[in-house]
From Swiss-Prot:
Protein name: Secretin OutD
Domain notes: The N0, N1, N2 and N3 domains are periplasmic, while the secretin and S domains form a channel that is partially inserted in the outer membrane. The N1, N2 and N3 domains each form a periplasmic ring. The secretin domain forms a double beta-barrel structure; the outer barrel has a diameter of about 110 Angstroms while the inner barrel forms the central gate with a small pore in the closed state.
Region (N3): 258-330
Region annotation S domain: where it falls in the sequence: 587-650
Keyword Ribonucleoprotein: no
Any one GO cellular component localisation term in the record: type II protein secretion system complex
Complex formation: Forms a cylindrical channel with 15 subunits.
Organism name: Pectobacterium carotovorum subsp. carotovorum (Erwinia carotovora subsp. carotovora)
Superkingdom of origin organism: Bacteria
Span list, region N0: 20-115
Site feature May serve as a pivot that allows opening of the central gate for substrate egress, where: 447
Length: 650
């Protein structure tokens, strides 16, 4: 290429020497242009191998060194090349599209860079989020030159790379936008309305205005201060004033009107809810202790048991809270069917054998544990010889004796042998069941009242007065179920099975009956429909006793004539089971009732073994049940009653 002109003019002035340049190139190789400029500016250049081509440019005015350098940068920029300043007065010339991947000088306030010089600048943002500038800054930088722009959220800064002039223009825009917003707060005390309710309404109105798509800085917000019953508004002045006006319009005294409602309950008991609702109302009033007197109003809650309803008098906002509580409490509560099984087997064997001797002159060997003393029987025999009667003592002794007694009474000698073998077996199988509401205690008792001698007193006329009490024996079941999550039931159980012991197990001291009692008091967690053992006992006991005459009673074989032996063995097996079933709706309740009824009907038919067409009450003798909507159930009950009674209806 031909270098047409590349002159350097040095001109002198009266004050100082300065260098001025004039440039005119036509069809000149770009590398020749770079070499000429670098020589004039006394710069060392490093040219990328990809830099090639020709340029044509002409300057008609003289330029100083700074202007000449900017002219150099602008020419290269037009032809798609970029100058990267390096240390030691070195310039690196590369293609503009490769500039993003190379290191560039970091511009600061003292050295911001000028013109088309490529630099990197970090711009801090103080009042808004840096990411909000990312899109706009990136578009400006890309349009001016294919630079880069990004944001770093942890430090809230914008990082830009590009021409120094473009970056300076973008920074000016950022500084103008990054201004502190008007965040003044205005507090509005309320005299009549509740701050919470007013703020809720104002915020709802503001949500409706969001359709206008106003920027966030042009909107106002309002919050409630329940402690002082006031509202605080903040934001853009015009929007804040609009919010203040709305709050003042809503804070007006209302005309006196009735705040009494009658609420009819569907499931809950009105009297039970009064205490709960009164506590809730008192809690709401406590939260408003620092509110204005106009907001503090008395709450009255009464129950009308005849209609199962509540009469509530309260302020409108408190009334709404109470109605929500009532709606959550007045629900259909699930029920629990609790079935218990008591299975007990008792087996007792006893043997009592004794021999007693007596001599009117020498003495007696007597064993009172036999229940028949020889002295009493000899006295009765003497009286029988005299007047033909046994006497009261002998008659009483024989009346309370069980077993066999044999002996002789001749002259002064008498002998009495007693023997008793006893065996008792007691089987108990009981299946009490009861249905109760969740968290409601229920009691089931089946038994009888047994007289028990409590005390006796003998008067001066030898009259005996006895005090008798009644003790209930049988089956007692008390449960309180609590339904937990996942169909599990927490059961608080009090279960008792009691009975009167048989005569062989009772004391012979005539102090009254002996009672067998089995009691369980515990709490178990059971899944609905599962059967668990809540208690059990396996017991075996053997009692052996011997009363004998010293020395004589130890003689082999003959020793049995001078002693009394007693042996008793008892075995007992007791198990207590329980099964809860949750009943949540009508269909489950009907299913449980039908199952129980059919089980009862089948058991009765099995025990009675009533043949078809035999006996029973006549149809016209039966108590007529209304056949309204369930004829099938009526027919089932009718057939069961007929099967229960014997033939002839008696």
């Amino acid at each position: 290429m031909l270098l047409l002109s590349g002159s350097v003019l040095l001109m002198a002035s009266s004050l100082a020497w300065s260098a001025e340049f004039s440039a005119s190139f036509k069809g000149t190789d770009i590398q020749e242009f770079i070499n000429t400029v670098s020589k004039n500016l006394n710069k060392t250049v490093i040219i990328d191998p990809s830099v090639s081509g020709t340029i044509t440019v002409r300057s008609y005015d003289m330029m100083n060194e700074e202007q000449y350098y900017q002219f150099f940068l602008s020419v290269l920029d037009v032809y798609g090349f970029t100058v990267i300043p390096m240390d030691n007065n070195v310039l690196k010339i590369i293609r503009s599209k490769d500039a993003k991947s190379t290191s560039m000088p970091l511009a600061t306030d003292r050295q911001p860079g000028i013109g088309d010089e490529v630099v990197t600048r970090v711009v801090p943002v103080n009042n808004v989020a840096a990411r909000d500038f990312g899109r706009s800054s990136r578009e400006l930088n890309d349009n001016a030159w294919r630079g880069t722009c990004g944001d770093y959220e942890p430090a809230n800064v914008v990082v830009m790379t590009g021409r120094a002039g473009v970056i300076h223009a973008v920074m000016t825009i950022v500084e103008r936008v990054d201004q502190t917003g008007d965040r003044n707060v205005t507090t509005i005390p309320l005299s009549y309305a509740s701050s919470t309710e007013v703020v809720k309404m104002v915020n709802e109105l503001n949500k409706m205005d969001e359709k206008s798509a106003l920027p966030g800085m042009l909107t106002a917000n309002v919050v409630a201060d329940e402690r002082t019953n006031s509202a605080a508004g903040f934001g853009e002045p015009n929007s804040r004033q609009r919010v203040i006006d709305m709050v003042k319009q809503l804070d007006r005294q209302q005309a006196v009107q009735g705040n009494t409602k009658v609420i009819y309950l569907k499931y809950a008991k009105a009297a039970d809810l009064v205490e709960v609702l009164t506590g809730v109302g008192d809690s709401i009033q406590t939260d408003q202790q620092n509110a204005l007197p106009a907001l503090r109003k008395d709450i009255s809650i009464k129950a009308h048991e005849q209609t199962n309803s509540l009469i509530v008098n309260a302020a409108p906002d408190i009334m709404r809270d109470l109605e929500q509580v009532i709606a959550q409490l007045d629900i259909r509560r699930p029920q629990v069917l609790v079935e218990a099984i008591i299975a007990e087997v008792q087996d007792a064997d006893g043997m009592n054998l004794g021999v007693q001797w007596a001599n009117k002159n020498a003495g007696v060997t007597q064993f009172t544990n036999t229940g028949l003393p020889i002295t009493t029987m000899m006295a009765g025999a003497d009286q029988f010889r005299r007047d033909g009667t046994l006497g009261t003592a002998a008659t009483t002794a024989l009346g309370g004796f069980n077993g066999i007694a044999a002996g002789f009474y001749q002259g002064n000698w008498g002998m009495l042998m007693t023997a008793l073998s006893s065996n008792s077996k007691n089987d108990i199988l009981a299946t009490p069941s009861i249905v109760t509401l969740d968290n409601m205690e229920a009691t089931f008792n089946v038994g009888q009242e047994v007289p028990v001698l409590a005390g006796s007193q003998t008067t001066s006329g030898d009259n005996v007065f006895q005090t008798v009490e009644r003790k209930t024996v049988g089956i007692k079941l008390k449960v309180k179920p609590q339904i937990n999550e996942g169909d599990s039931v927490l059961l608080e159980i009090e279960q008792e099975v009691s009975s009167v012991a048989d005569a062989a197990s009772s004391s012979s001291t005539n102090l009254g009956a002996t009672f067998n009692t089995r009691t369980v008091n515990n709490a178990v967690l059971v899944s609905s429909g599962d059967t668990v053992v809540v208690g059990g006992l396996l017991d075996k006991s053997t009692n052996e006793s011997a009363n004998k005459v010293p020395l004589l009673g130890d003689i082999p074989v003959l020793g049995y004539l001078f002693r009394s032996n007693s042996t008793e063995t008892k075995k007992r097996n007791l198990m207590l089971f329980i099964r809860p079933s949750i009943i949540r709706d009508r269909s489950q309740f009907q299913s449980a009732s039908a199952s129980k009824y059919h089980s009862f009907s089948a058991e009765e038919n099995k025990q009675r073994n009533v043949s078809n067409g035999e006996g029973g009450l006549l149809d016209n003798d039966l108590l007529r049940l209304p056949e309204g909507g369930n004829a099938y159930t009526f027919r089932q009950v009718q057939s069961s009653i007929v099967a229960f009674y014997p033939a002839g209806g008696k």
